[in-house]
Each structure stands twice: as structure tokens, then as C-alpha cells.
């Protein structure tokens, strides 16, 4: 089994992106699966194109894209991606689409095809904070998640999803007091736990993780 795991390059004035910093520290094998690690640009155009190119090149069984969610207290396993780009800040190419579809005429949304609840429980079982999320935002993270799910929708052999990670502790300088973060080693270990859960669970858990907000 091959797992393609991607992380973004730095954006928004940050010197690092904990997504790729953690991804590149992952072991080359998790639960018997080969881990293929790639960096992709934080760009609506180039990021989506690169992840599709990597899928074509690597022919993975599983795709897990990883992005930074500054302000998150732990990992967020994303359940849904929407066909909308509404960028609060420009991407790394200076593009700032507002209220634009990612794929004109495409589905309004796609659900992750990974066992998202099993991933949450797998990370929590290792002692790391993690929750199920029902919005991947409207920036490049959502764009990549949507594009991947749109690309693999006709191939049931490939399952895909997205995880957001918090700031690394090394990014806290200059940020407001109380801004949550995790040590980079912990982010990496939590990602490994999420991947292990994906490899070991072809179907998801049947338990309540809904929200009222």
C-alpha cells in the first residue's frame, strides 16, 4: 500500500509551515504502508496542479494532504471540502480569488473518503489533541482537498482526505499570548497516528461526532 502525504510551503509571512515540516519527518513506512512525502506550493493554481501531478506519478492507494491552521489547539481531521475559493489573504503567487468556484460546474462539495472518525480516535489514543472538523475553510487547503477528491471520485481504489495541524511551538514568537501550538515532534507523531488509523481501517467508526454550531 502506498500513501501520498503532502504538506504546504510557508505562507502568510511565516518562515516555516509545520505541515510540511512534520510531513518530511514522518517515517518511510507506517503500519506496513509506504509513505511518499511531497511539498506543494500554497497556491490556488500551482498547488492544485502539483498534487494532481503527484497522484498521477505516484499512483497511491491513499492521499492525505496536510495544512496549517493557525489558532487550532490540535489536529483537525477535515470531513468536507466545498467548491469555493474566497481568500482572506493572497496566496504565494499573489492570487486572491473571491467567491469563485474551484471547478466551474463541479459538485458543490465532496466528503473525505478516509475513515475520519477512526483517525480522530487514533490520534487521541496516542495522547494528542484532535477533533473532527466540518469546514476546511475557503483558502488553498480547501482548494487542494476539493481538487483531490474531485480528481479521484471516479477511482474507488484511491481514498483521500485532509488534516489541519496547529502552529509549531517555534512559530510563537511575536504572536499573541495564549496562541496554541504543538512541538513539531508531537505534530509528526500525531500525523503518524492518523495515518496508521487510515491504513488499519477500511471503514469508519459508527459513533457520534456531530456538532450543534
Regions found by a protein language model. Give the residues of each.
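N-terminal catalytic or cofactor-binding beta/alpha core of small enzyme domains
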Residues: 1-136, 149-157, 177-213
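Hydrophobic, aromatic-enriched interface-forming segments
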Residues: 140-149
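Glycine-rich phosphate/pyrophosphate-binding loops
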Residues: 160
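An accessory alpha-helical subdomain
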Residues: 164-170
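Short conserved micro-motifs at the rims of enzyme active sites and ligand-binding pockets
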Residues: 172-175
Amino acid at each position: 500500500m502506498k500513501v501520498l502525504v503532502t504538506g504546504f510551503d510557508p505562507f502568510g509571512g511565516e518562515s516555516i509551515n509545520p505541515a510540511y515540516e512534520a510531513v518530511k519527518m514522518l517515517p518511510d513506512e507506517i503500519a506496513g504502508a509506504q509513505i511518499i512525502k511531497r511539498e506543494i506550493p500554497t497556491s490556488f493554481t500551482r498547488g492544485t496542479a502539483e498534487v494532481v501531478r503527484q497522484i498521477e506519478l505516484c499512483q497511491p492507494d491513499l492521499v492525505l494532504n496536510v495544512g496549517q491552521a493557525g489558532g487550532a489547539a490540535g489536529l483537525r481531521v477535515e470531513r468536507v471540502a466545498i467548491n469555493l475559493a474566497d481568500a482572506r489573504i493572497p496566496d504565494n503567487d499573489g492570487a486572491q480569488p473571491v467567491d469563485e468556484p474551484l471547478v466551474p460546474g463541479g459538485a458543490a462539495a465532496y466528503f473525505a473518503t478516509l475513515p475520519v472518525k477512526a483517525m480522530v480516535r487514533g490520534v487521541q489514543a496516542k495522547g494528542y489533541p484532535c477533533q473532527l472538523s466540518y469546514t476546511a475553510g475557503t483558502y488553498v487547503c480547501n482548494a487542494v482537498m476539493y481538487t483531490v477528491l474531485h480528481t479521484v471520485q471516479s477511482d474507488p481504489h484511491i481514498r483521500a482526505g485532509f488534516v489541519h495541524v496547529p502552529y509549531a511551538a517555534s512559530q510563537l514568537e511575536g504572536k499573541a499570548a495564549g496562541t496554541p501550538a504543538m512541538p513539531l515532534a508531537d505534530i509528526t507523531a500525531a500525523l503518524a497516528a492518523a495515518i496508521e488509523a487510515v491504513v488499519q481501517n477500511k471503514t469508519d467508526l459508527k459513533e457520534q461526532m456531530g456538532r450543534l454550531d
